[in-house]
Amino acid sequence: MNIFDRKINFDALLKFSHITPSTQQHLKKVYASFALCMFVAAAGAYVHVVTHFIQAGLLSALGSLALMIWLMATPHSHETEQKRLGLLAGFAFLTGVGLGPALELCIAVNPSILPTAFMGTAMIFTCFSLSALYARRRSYLFLGGILMSAMSLMLLSSLGNLFFGSIWLFQANLYLGLLVMCGFVLFDTQLIIEKAEHGDKDYIWHCVDLFLDFVTLFRKLMLILAFNEKDKKKEKK
């Protein structure tokens, strides 16, 4: 039998038998909201980079934080669903605006960095999300403590680097941050599944977790590529 004649069973590939149907429906809502966030964040980034109508700064950062807190404080119910989706869209928009300075930096170095970083982030996020979805339930939840410890270490090193000003430490933080965020995609995806299995169906807030994972991954990868490109240009000179 010719192995090239075999048909791929896509239904089997997309079958998550260890996840209950209600949780699968919940995940569909989470990823639909995530897609909305990506679209709105792209609009926010466009406003900063192209139109300059709204610029990233202290006000946009505070606005983003305020909307996230407001969203978190608003209880999840059918009556508040539309309001919370509006808050989510506003948060995603200002988050996109906040990406503006990093985007401008990369455009100044090499505009091709942006599509490369986005496609790379999308591939990383998709692969790690599928790994978490296909894996045995709770198999990645042990990462929580390790990831939080790594985040604390990164925070301390970033604060220390304010005094040392080491470019090597900054770049090491970028690479470590990229690795940590890959871990958070695994952890957050499985945590969302477990919360949904235990009755927590707040898909809007669960979407925030994954959206922040993606944005942070994108920012880290974008800056890594930008620094590598700058190093290549220096070597050519």
UniProtKB/Swiss-Prot annotation:
InterPro entries: Bax_inhbtr1_CS, Bax_inhibitor_1-related
One BP term from GO: endoplasmic reticulum calcium ion homeostasis
Membrane topology, Lumenal segments: 51-52, 108-112, 161-166
Modification after translation: Ubiquitinated by BFAR, leading to proteasomal degradation.
Main location: endoplasmic reticulum
Location in or out of the cell: Endoplasmic reticulum membrane
Keyword Transmembrane helix: yes
Key words, A-Z: Apoptosis, Autophagy, Calcium, Endoplasmic reticulum, Isopeptide bond, Membrane, Transmembrane, Transmembrane helix, Ubl conjugation, Unfolded protein response
Residues in compartment: Cytoplasmic: 1-29, 74-86, 134-139, 188-206, 228-237
GO terms assigned for molecular function: endoribonuclease inhibitor activity; enzyme binding; ubiquitin protein ligase binding
Knockout or disruption consequences: Tmbim6-deficient mice are viable and develop normally although they exhibit increased vulnerability to tissue damage induced by stimuli that trigger ER stress.
Membrane topology, from the record: Multi-pass membrane protein
Intramembrane parts of the chain: 207-227
Cross-link (Glycyl lysine isopeptide (Lys-Gly) (interchain with G-Cter in ubiquitin)): 7
Tissue: Highly abundant in adult testis.
Transmembrane intervals: 30-50, 53-73, 87-107, 113-133, 140-160, 167-187
Cellular component, GO, one term: endoplasmic reticulum membrane
Function: Endoplasmic reticulum (ER)-resident protein that confers cellular protection as an anti-apoptotic protein by limiting multiple stress-inducing pathways surrounding the endoplasmic reticulum and mitochondria. Inhibits the activities of the key sensor for the endoplasmic reticulum unfolded protein response IRE1alpha/ERN1 both directly and by blocking BAX/BAK binding. Modulates ER calcium homeostasis by acting as a calcium-leak channel. Negatively regulates autophagy and autophagosome formation, especially during periods of nutrient deprivation, and reduces cell survival during starvation.
Classification via PANTHER family: BAX INHIBITOR 1, BAX INHIBITOR-RELATED
Domain notes: The intra-membrane loop at the C-terminus acts as a calcium pore, mediating calcium leak from the ER into the cytosol.
Quaternary structure (record): Interacts with BCL2. Interacts with BCL2L1. Interacts with ERN1.
Family: Belongs to the BI1 family.
Protein known as: Bax inhibitor 1
Gene source species: Mus musculus (Mouse)
